[in-house]
Amino acid sequence: MSAAAGPQRKVYLHIGAPKTGTTYVQDRLSLNARSLAAHGVHFPTRTPMVSAGLFHFRAALDLLGQDWGGPAGHAEGGWAALVRRVKRRSGTVVISHEILAPATREAIAKAKRDLAGSEIHIVYSARDLARQLPAAWQESVKQGRKWTYRRFLSRIAHGRPWFYQALDLPTVLEAWGAGIDPAHVHVVTVPPKGAPRDLLWQRYCEVLGIDPTWAPRDSDRHNQSLGVAETQVIRKLNRRMDRQTRREASYDGLIREMLAQGELVGRVSQPVRMPPRLQSWAEAETERWLTWIRDSGVDVVGDLEDLRPLPLAEGERFVNPDKVSTKQQLRVAMDALSAMTREAARRPDPDQQLIRRVRTQAKRLRE
């Protein structure tokens, strides 16, 4: 049966969490948008020239009252534009971006108010803290943060950074789920390491009412992890350049896309792990999450046991990212410098381009 069955529009607000496979899910929805729409499932975009992922990112920024990740003002009007497209659709509509998770109560109230008349569902994917904390630190460094792993973890333990506001399942879902039937609040657990590659997507399909055959095109978008040495080099580069967190689009393509998500991933390097000293804390936090989930009556897709943080495997050792040897960092830095040099050689000289344009214009004037 088509997901569009029934007269009422269903809007699924997929709000995160960050680092839980959201990039993959968004890209797969986008790649299969046409075939999904034929079955009444819509992942709206503004124009064919603007990807759905970028459209939803700008809409989320606008709803949150933020302006970063692009030219000044690039998100202005984004939320209203998305809402207009939602209201033109019937059946199932998906809105997705992970920066929505830590939204203020005012922003959440506006989202619900603007989507009034639709059956609103909240979708939140959760991952065990043993994998989530290292991934969150790496992501913050990719976005320009300069803090050490130790400082990041210290702040996490006190619940202060934006990332943990987005990761603390009870806090997020109490805010977004207020006034919504618990049966319409969906927790999707991220499968453990070694699970079938397609399992997370199958869980999303179950939540969204998608027959997997409606979305045959797979995505190769995966936000791959950096090793300890690679993350440390990016962090020091941020500090040396005094890079502003998340805001400098001019650096984004070079540092984030080319280095942190391109040149420096897939290297043979020690992975970033959660320190063993935080194991008991992570287990206590997880128990708090599980108790909240069971008491709240929200819908769970997946296995709650997936959320339990596993200790380091036997024979596996923790490598402190803050104490990586200079020799290891030098190798990474040389590879990064080589990549930057190749990129600089590939790009045209803007001064030479300007000179050519001036000469061309002068020639036209003489003629």
Q: PLM ranges: what are they?
A:
Residues 1-367:
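Anion-recognition interface
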